């Protein structure tokens, strides 16, 4: 089995756990609250990254375009979409991108696109 095939299988079987390996993110244990916590962890990570960038480039730093390579279910793409004009999420697994699309629709982000690599 190739790694691409493995990621496709993870995306079908256990997409959130494949991104953050905490048992509460397993498909059979994922509650609505756990999913919200999962997505909130992405927002915290994006805030940390943007704060670091602003420390280097100045408080005015605002990304125009973001590439989320290995975007999985959109954990980082979605909060980046609130900050940037355009976000592109790329992943080797169509199953992960399908879940990212659902999450993106639920979060009402329209400036995000994706593709399989």
What are the residue ranges of the model-derived segments?
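Class I SAM-dependent methyltransferase SAM/SAH-binding core
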Residues: 67, 75-117
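Short, contiguous, helix-prone interaction/anchoring segments in small proteins
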Residues: 27-44
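N-terminal, positively charged/glycine-rich alpha-helical extensions of SAM-dependent methyltransferases
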Residues: 1-32
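A structural signal for well-ordered alpha-helical scaffolds and beta->alpha junctions
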Residues: 1-4, 42-46, 93
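Conserved alpha-helix/loop element of class I SAM-dependent methyltransferases that forms part
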Residues: 40-63
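Conserved class I S-adenosyl-L-methionine
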Residues: 62-70
